[in-house]
Amino acid sequence: MFEKSVEELTELGAQITTAEIAQQPELWRDTLNIYRENKEAIEAFLAEARAMGEGRLSVVFTGAGTSDYVGDTCAPYLRHAGNTDLYDFKPIATTDIVSAPRDFLRDEDPTLVVSFARSGNSPESLAAVAVAKELVHNVKFLNITCGPEGKLAVESADDPNALTLLIPRANDKGFAMTGSYSCMTLLSTLIFDTASDEQKAEWVETIAKMGEEVISREPEIADYLAGDFNRVTYLGSGSFGGLAQESQLKILELAHGLVATSYDTSMGYRHGPKSFVDDKTLVFVFVNNDAYTRQYDIDILNEIGGDEIAQHTIAVQQEGATVYEGESFTFKGYEALPEGYLALPFVMFAQAISLLNSVRVGNTPDTPSPTGTVNRVVKGVTIHPFTA
């Protein structure tokens, strides 16, 4: 797909999505520059947020669908790489905040709501902000969005309690969130990671090179899809649990449900969900670089591979002291990356799988919902009035 002409891709209904997957390494470098250019404003805003009360500031990462999985991906990493003396990181979907506010927000907790949104126009994004303002006594809003003209950015422009950071080049035009997911994940990680800016820059350059490698290894990725399969499952631990959920959603969306999907944590999969696996199932496991966690990822790979039921059991991993010795997509020759950054080249692998599979089943990746019942920006949501 990545070597096809624009004309060939257009005929397949895949030109937009293919280009948006391929451009991500460049966008990650851009995102690093956005972080650098806004660092002073970010630090000043976070200082104001911390001043709202004593103790740790509740940092709520929120979004819907893929935007929700941004928080699910970065929060586990930041719970040990961020400053947890100052911040309590919590991923909570906008759909949960809006539908049951008191179950997820505490009125007395000083709170920073970090909203992730591609367009900034989904009803839940806007309603979550309104609900938080109504319920929480001391609250500020950090908006990370790709839509400069979206309602989230426009309506918060004059709000002294809000800071909006824009990643406009990541505002995907295709149906699926690809660059928007990876860039919002990266920017939030850069903001709260306590590593030095020099170290962050090195990690960003490494993931950009790994992303470029994903594109060049497309034939290898395509080989995993050569057989007759109708199920795909993704597993991962820590931050890769959120990544697994995002990866299975991409398969589901781009194939319009023609391939069944599941996801879980590496350890959780044994507790019932493993029943999903049959001889027409592809199992992908994202292998963590943390030496302790990695053992559990490799354990489930060895177990499922040893069962000899799944059509393929594939590790997505970086070369390390221990690796899965069975089928794998392995990145070699790079420094070992922490999970908050390694998630990005890993998701490019998953996006490539989803793109190739969409075409395999005869669907059009750029417009995968032929009935129009699933939309790029969610429609048909009724937001009911809320009073604290």
Question: Model-found features: residue ranges?
Answer:
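Glycine-rich phosphate-binding loops that contact phosphosugars or nucleotide phosphates
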Residues: G53-E205, S237, F286-E325, F329
